[in-house]
């Protein structure tokens, strides 16, 4: 299927912790600089971009010199709180090199599930677009809870990115991962696994080919990405799942290059 993204005027890009934090726990400065360059280039072309960025926990572990995620929820929230500040500080610094202004929006599920707060969030996004600012979104990990009587967590930022794409009316969601796209089976296990270039619908076969958890720094696995694609389909939009190793590939994707997996319903 030929890809044409010429009509894309509003774009959501999601980047995961594994793309921002090296296996050693150090911050991937080169990757963040490339991402800022790409988003700034798109911004200069008149495309409105929202960046949904994981990484608060990974940055927090780095700042506090901790080797692994704490088991206690309170400490997890504290580490994420420290990491969010460090992450946004770096983003602000790097984007400023390209004369691009950024802002921080921290969301919880209850914000988008209640009409009044959702309207406020939409107004905030629209105002930022009008001001020429790139919103950087993350879940508010320091206060989010996952309890039956008051669940405020999205689950992971794959889902959050699909929700943000719906909230802002994005023409396209690009999800950067540590894998090249959706394969017919797990490429880490099967050498003959084949990359699916195009997925027009989420079938039982597609669901069966997704499995496994995320990295030690993040939470998202392939199943969460498939569920995000389902949400994108429900909103009559489209999504590209691609490897985040080289953020400049985003520019090639928007030019029509067949990189990663395109989730788009047939016309």
From Swiss-Prot:
Pfam families: AA_kinase (PF00696). It comes from the Bacteria. It comes from Streptococcus thermophilus. Catalyzes the transfer of a phosphate group to glutamate to form L-glutamate 5-phosphate. Pathway: Amino-acid biosynthesis; L-proline biosynthesis; L-glutamate 5-semialdehyde from L-glutamate: step 1/2. It is found in: Cytoplasm. GO terms for biological process: L-proline biosynthetic process. Keywords: Amino-acid biosynthesis, ATP-binding, Cytoplasm, Kinase, Nucleotide-binding, Proline biosynthesis, Transferase. One of its GO terms (molecular function) is glutamate 5-kinase activity. Its EC number is 2.7.2.11. GO terms for cellular component: cytosol. Belongs to the glutamate 5-kinase family. The keyword Transcription regulation does not apply. PROSITE patterns: GLUTAMATE_5_KINASE. ATP binds at residues 14, 177-178, 219-225. This is Glutamate 5-kinase. Substrate binds at residues 54, 141, 157. It catalyses: L-glutamate + ATP = L-glutamyl 5-phosphate + ADP. NCBIfam families: proB. It is an enzyme of class 2 (transferase).
